[in-house]
Amino acid sequence: MARGKDARVTVILECTNCVRGGVTKESTGISRYITEKNRHNTPGQLELKKFCPYCYKQTIHGEIKK
């Protein structure tokens, strides 16, 4: 049987460039990705470089609260 909390949790990554710039008529939304992280290996907030279809380039996507 498993003991304690699960180490792996689901997190949502959101484009930091879209959030800072605000949603305008040019960008129709904010890019979000769903992924998993291991709490023991990465206790802090996760930041990954992913492609944003609204910015048309690779930007930093940061973890957000659910």
From Swiss-Prot:
Classification via Pfam families: Ribosomal_L33 (PF00471)
Gene3D superfamilies: Ribosomal protein L33
Keywords, comma-separated and alphabetical: Chloroplast, Plastid, Ribonucleoprotein, Ribosomal protein
Keyword Ribonucleoprotein: yes
Localization of this protein: Plastid, Chloroplast
Primary site of residence: plastid
PROSITE patterns attached to this UniProt entry: RIBOSOMAL_L33 (PS00582)
An MF annotation (GO) of this entry: structural constituent of ribosome
Regions crossing the membrane: none
Family according to the record: Belongs to the bacterial ribosomal protein bL33 family.
Listed name of the protein: Large ribosomal subunit protein bL33c
Gene of this entry: rpl33
